[in-house]
Amino acid sequence: MLNRRQFILWTTSAILLNACSGKKKRYAKISQGSTILALGDSLTAGYGVGRGEDYPSQLTKLTDFNVINGGVSGDTSEQALARLQPLLDEHNPKLVIVSIGGNDFLRKLPESTTRQNIGQIIKRIQAKNIPVILVAIPHFTASALIGSVKEHPLYDDLAKEYDVALLKGAWAKVLGDDSMKSDMVHGNAKGYRFFAEQMADFFKQIGVIR
């Protein structure tokens, strides 16, 4: 049996371990005016809203970063991977937000392919010593029709595997709320604004803004 001193030491160690495991990934502060690349599909491009209402534009206003909209409607993870290198070369971003995968799920592409493509996206960005924020995307199933939107678990796996910050819950909240979406799979101006606010707050949580 453990004596009192051993028990206290064991309990303290367990508490500290749990506290550490719950911490968010921390990044270095990024200077105001720096360029950030938002890589993604129609949710990034701002499908369904007017000019300046997409989330990268709204995030620019909230943070004073130059957020480049690298979203293309209809893009799969494979297509985003193919576009990535020219975007990195052109913009030389200090941070990349990766929000991709929804079209893979809608088209029922193999999960292994989506996982591999997003992993390659992260690896190519990290090869340039650029920090990555991965965004969890909802897995559209029949339950989404009644407002129960859940994120695909592969994003948790990828965030752990590549040691990157993961923003969870933002798109699920938008697409689960009729007041924030223009259709089943796209936000409206209010929804994209909400996402931008969530991302700006996440910047503070992980140290990008201090």
Predicted features, each with a name:
Residues 16, 68, 133:
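Conserved Rossmann-like nucleotide-binding pocket used by diverse enzymes
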Residues 61-62, 82-210:
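Alpha-helical cap/lid subdomain in secreted, periplasmic
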